[in-house]
Amino acid sequence: MKKTILLASVCAALLQACAPVSSPGEGSSTMSTTASSSRSALSLPAYYWRLAAATDASGKAIPALQRGIEQPLRLSFSADGMNIRGGCNTQFGGYTYKDGGLRVATLASTMKACEPGLMKLDAEIGQRLKGDLRATLSGESTEPALELVAQDGSVLKFVGEPTPETLYGSAGETMFLEVAPKRADCSHPMIPRYQCLMVRERRYNDAGVQLPPQEDWHPLYQSIEGYDHRDGVRTVLRVKRYDWKNPPADAPSKVYVM
């Protein structure tokens, strides 16, 4: 009898030891970790940050900054510093971002004169984007959001738009393209009777003097992002050329962005 009881106890212990271990909320914990990993993958330099809302410490909209939502006003971050564009002048300065805190160094600015509304926009955003701010990155990589809380309690909310480097998956090469005054008929594989920009690369020496052309005019079978061609006007553009890592089937493998 004792042997039977002992054998049953051993079997029960073995079955318990071999059973899979689980804990309440195991599935939700995994989902939380996945979401957290997605958020931690977000980075300030990977996006242009467009102003979407601006409120003061009491939650009221800041009138002078509403112009920056319509314009829109945009932040960008790089190894060289932070840039603010969309007002009258470009403002720029150093920054550090760590553990949910954004520290902005004293901003410098270009010195254009504009209508009062844009000048006020520059002053208001510069007044808030200084010193230590509380920064919160949220959302997924496809729809990121940035919230900045200034020292006066103002809350600035931004939505992220991928930079070309993020969108195309390459660093990009800076080059100069000369664009001919007239478009020319070209054989586009997707668009009948298409007219291409005629371009050629231009180079400069260390003194900034333009060198003689090293190639003939040739058709560009795509647009240049950020460039609107004026018929009859020849121009030289400073562009970045990106290798598109995973382009759609009907898209070019290289992209030109001003």
What do these predicted regions represent?
Residues C18-H229, K240-M258:
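Lipid interaction determinants
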